[in-house]
Amino acid sequence: MGVRLGTFLDDQEELGPVICRNMQKEKSISFSTNTPNASRHMEYYSLSKSKSNRHMEPFFINIAPAPANEYEMSSHEGEEFIIVANGEIEINYGNETYVLKKGDSIYYDSIVPHHVHAYNNQTASILAVVYVPA
């Protein structure tokens, strides 16, 4: 669509720093792929929705297990950084597959088709920072 993900989450804009307290996080959005009957397996919590003129989109994301037939690769301009906070995730990136555990991280060009999902039918949580060029 050519629009950064955070555009749909913006509220009031702040010119200075934005602080997001752990206990005050609000679920911003939850979704999965466009696959018919897909479950909503990813809950996004925006960590910067009121920051004006931002180019990075930091999110805390809870990932529930989802059936493999719901995995649909996506791509967009920019870069992504992910660190696993809890559990394990699997990332399909191009023709490669990576399994990351708590404390592991990955940084990649998001123009390459990719999909992030919980691994081994367990829940997981990640911190993801998405950069989309202006």
PLM regions with names:
Residues 62-64, 75-91:
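Short, conserved beta-strand element in jelly-roll/cupin
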Residues 1-7, 12-13:
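DNA major-groove recognition helix of helix-turn-helix/homeodomain DNA-binding modules
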Residues 24-34, 40-50, 57-76, 110-113:
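Conserved short histidine dyad/triad with adjacent acidic residue
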Residues 47, 94-110:
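Short acidic-glycine-tyrosine-enriched beta hairpin
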Residues 14-27:
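Long, charged amphipathic helices and adjacent flexible linkers at domain junctions
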Residues 71-72, 80, 96:
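Short, conserved secondary-structure segments in the cores of folded domains
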Residues 40-43, 101-102, 110-134:
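Ligand-binding loop in jelly-roll beta-barrel domains
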Residues 12, 77, 96, 112, ...:
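A generic "binding-loop/recognition-motif" signal
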